[in-house]
């Protein structure tokens, strides 16, 4: 059966007209999801840089201006040392430590399984490169995991607080050691 056609095409007659009306609403969820693709993905596809999105209505928050970065550490001692340092340096407003995660990964041709501590770091998106550089400089792993995701929505007072706490670093324009 050719699933690329509307079901009414296979039936013919009056059923075609009836099913074509039923078929169109079925496409609406798919079409609406396509319209909600992040601007960054759409701009990457077109080759043009993403434009700054407008602030969320009434909150003054610019979607994506705060990021949640994730870093794995071999143990709680290392995670606490890095967490304290990034908060003291104002590279992050807050770091949550999530103990006893299990990571399964391939390393140098071998499947590994380790118990680790996951750090969830809230910072300004503009500070992610400096945060990454700092974590790489102090992390014991040969290849430290530092990944960040932009925060599109959240509690406006909290997101404002993240900006306030890290503002002096983001305005200085200097990279930290």
Swiss-Prot record:
Keyword field: Signal
BP GO annotations: protein localization; response to metal ion
GO molecular function, one term: enzyme binding
Extent of the signal sequence: 1-32
GO cellular component terms, A-Z: membrane; mitochondrion
Classification via InterPro entries: Ion_tolerance_CutA (IPR004323), N-reg_PII-like_a/b (IPR011322), N-reg_PII/ATP_PRibTrfase_C (IPR015867)
Domain of life of the source: Eukaryota
Quaternary structure, from the entry: Homotrimer.
Family designation: Belongs to the CutA family.
Protein name according to UniProt: Protein CutA
Phylogenetic lineage: Eukaryota, Metazoa, Chordata, Craniata, Vertebrata
